[in-house]
Amino acid sequence: MSETLNVCGLTIERGTKLRTYLPIPDTNVKIPLTIINGENDGPTLLITAGIHGGEYPGIAAAMELGRDIEPENVTGCLIMMHPVNIQGFWARREMIVPEDGKNLNRVFPGDPTVTLADKTAYLISNNFFPIADFYVDMHSGDIHESLHPYVYYPGQPTPEIEKKSRSVARVLDMEYMVRSLATGGAYNYAASTGLPSILIERGGAGLCLHEDIEAYKDDIRNILRKLKMFSLPVKPRHHSPRDVENLIYLEALETGCWLHHIHSGDFVEEGQVLGRITDVFGNTLTTYYAEQTGVILYVCPALASPKGTILVAYGTIKEFDDED
């Protein structure tokens, strides 16, 4: 990193902090942005929170970290956007950008000539991915999603990118991590360009709990320490992530009312009832059973369940860790 950071017409001198709004070109929308250019040379960490506007703990954590961290505590440069999907945030909309109905996380790398979601993705991928050395995408369960904390790292790019991403995922204070084989999404696209990346899931169901915010702040501090960017001590961890494999994303076969029998974080046995879909008169339409023994990472807690809704995500815990 040079003495001065220049990005999107902004100039941030070494040893200074900038808190401002970043305009999305050809729109009236501006993203809250914090850039902390540390007093000493080092890596650049890019953090996005609120790509989905209803996922609150990561947004609140990024806001508070941007307020509290000072340049004298940072080696390198910390860039945070909070929230990226500012329109969805104020509208309290789950998943989508209200102006175009698109899932922002599904349109990367974006396009500057299309709609707001595409322009936002392009702004990030074209201006910020190239200057970053590591990327963290902060998520939660959305308004209709309850989850147990876990982290994704990309498994599709080069072995070197996967190894770097996984090494950072391992410093988080959570029980599980997942090697993603997907190619879509902001962090997977970033990894495909050579940028080591992770996606963290913590909190959800439209809640913004103090304990989730604080845990998320500890996550980011641990990452900063891992990247040798942070000079302040971090709290000791209670957990070290273990790999969860063979993920099953159970979809609703029909529209109906979902009554779940399990919760995120539960262990289930093969053949165990996960839940059932009824009609609006309470008559059971379909009962869903676990296809394998494993841990529940995610449950839809909502009663209303349109066809295709992801009801449960669960997988098997890897018996041995490659790095243990």
Predicted features by range, described:
Residues M1-D324:
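Structured catalytic-domain cores with a bias toward divalent-metal coordination
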